[in-house]
Amino acid sequence: MKRYTFVGGLFLLALAVRLWRLTTHSLWFDETMSLFWAGQPVARIWEVGLHLVEDKHPPLYYSLLHGWMGLFGSSDAAVRSLGSLLGALAVLPACGMGYLLGDRRSGALAGLLVALNPFLVWYSQEVRMFMPAATFALFGLYGLLRSLLSPQSSALSPRPAALRLGWWALALLGLVGAVYSYLFSAFLLPVAALWLLVLWLWMMRQGQSLGAWRFFLCGAFVLALAGALIAPLLWAAWRVSGGESLPGRMFGGMAEALARLAAAYTLHRGPWGEGAVHTAQVGAGLLTLLGLLLPLRGRASTGFSHSQMGYLGALGRPLLALYLFLPLFVGGLLQSRDRTIFDEPRYFTFLVPAFCLLWGRALAALWQRVRLLGWVALAAVLAVHLVALSHLWLPQNLREDWRTAAAYVETHAGANDAVLVHVDYVRIPFQRYFGGPQPVFFPFTERLNDPAQVEPPLLGLLPFDSVWLVQSHTQEFDPHHLVERWLAERFPLATEQYPAGITVKRFLTRYRLPELPPDVPRLDAACGPHITLAGCAVDDERTPATDERSHPPSAWVHVRLYWRTEAKPPADYTATVRMVDGLGQVWGERLYREQETLRVWPTSRWEPGEIVRQEVDVNLNPITPPGEYRIVAGLADAAGQPVGSEVICGAVQVVK
């Protein structure tokens, strides 16, 4: 009972860690694609998932998410909680496998490491199939082991045959479910097959020929059935990959790939110095090696027969070696067909529990030999995990921040503005968060190589007052930034924001106006030779002094200026905009940009009576204390000297 209580506690710990700051990150593009497919009818999900043409992932995870959303809704917290729950459940088979292939201590340590592993926590908090598939695979492998080790008939389990059948069912459902969630999980089927063969051979050597053959035949049937169930899916994947993937060299760059995996599966996200990364790689490799080499001394009573349990502890090392290295070997072979097999550590998420199992064995073996060394090693591993966990939610590690991008556009866009999303498919995450009335356009669906491809769609945006260009994933489809260049060559830049993975820029397509817009407070204050500040508006009247998402460390206050001239100004001037306190001390200064209005349309070219629209961002001192501040604007000559009086544009409340 104590063991089950401990495992339950580890599960609750894992769940708590995975629910912690669950919505700190915005959903990024891949996650919103999960929601897109999960929002389709189930029949459509399976049609697409079995052919792997429109989407490259199988249908099971999307189907589970479809049902989950039907029960709990589609908020960020709701859709991410499914992955958190499934990720936390991985602790249960990890503890069980560590126990069966080692001892109670190694099982407990393996479960603890799975609970706190930063890589597993990160992907448990993502609306994708990588962590759920890893959990399903763990349950499948655990079911295979337990089908061999079902207890003898007792008052607590009077029907061992039925129980054994249940474990075989778990093995089948786990392995098939893993592949139907994520294709690379198929790399574990050879692992299961070799486990079956090794266990059969060992039982034969133990003189249990009848039990060995019964186990082998049942296992062979289960694995054959699993293979038959996933064969159509694997054939579809093979057929599709042949036409789309680029071949590489078999086992090319394996050393670099393994080093990258070791760093990712221990530290995952920075900031880490090069020394810390190398130390983590060496430490992970050393612990893995110790887990493979050091035998555990003795076994506590397990509740199973001595003949059954006495050899599984000895087989733990070779079985775990197969679990870890065979998928890597298969991946190395498949590099000849697809050179991107090892491009992303997440592709092999299902291997992280194998590392945790080996690390748990290594720590248990060290503790048995030199107890102090075992405690020190455990403390070091936990310290690395905990520090790495704290890094998951740092601003520099944010996923694509579509929530922040959409919120900024929504709160700052005018009634006659337009939003241009580029490239076209990233409209899906943007529109998830954008609730403004402005139209959203996404005309560019192909790679852009010629400026002639850009102009016709963009000419249609000229009737709008300004165009918000929201860009992401442009490296492949617009490597020369043709869309942005077309806008920048013609219109002033009003603002630029840089949420993680995204660029937001506002271009003023109508910056020469016949009159002051009705929603702008009128000032009519003289600021320089023949120049009047007709109106001014402060868009961010309440703000903290710092910003962690769009342009850390300082917050920006956006200010709109509307100038008017009664006669042609004698020279070119620049606008000065500052934030000052009651004593006149400066706490914020405007940012100067090459493409701002007074450079695109300098004052010496102004026509009498026209209104010239200019927008600037005031960069705040990040240590600005909370309180009331004023935004003051004026003009300066080419030498930076003021040419008139400053005018109060509005007030800003700086808050904590």
Name every feature range the model reports, one short phrase each.
Residues 6-149, 164-513:
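Membrane-proximal helix-loop-helix interfaces that form the catalytic/acceptor-binding platform
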Residues 32, 59, 105, 119, ...:
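Intrinsic disorder/low-complexity detector
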Residues 150-157:
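Arg/Gly-rich low-complexity intrinsically disordered repeat tracts
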Residues 407-416, 425-428, 440-656:
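C-terminal luminal/periplasmic domains and tails of membrane-associated envelope-modifying transferases
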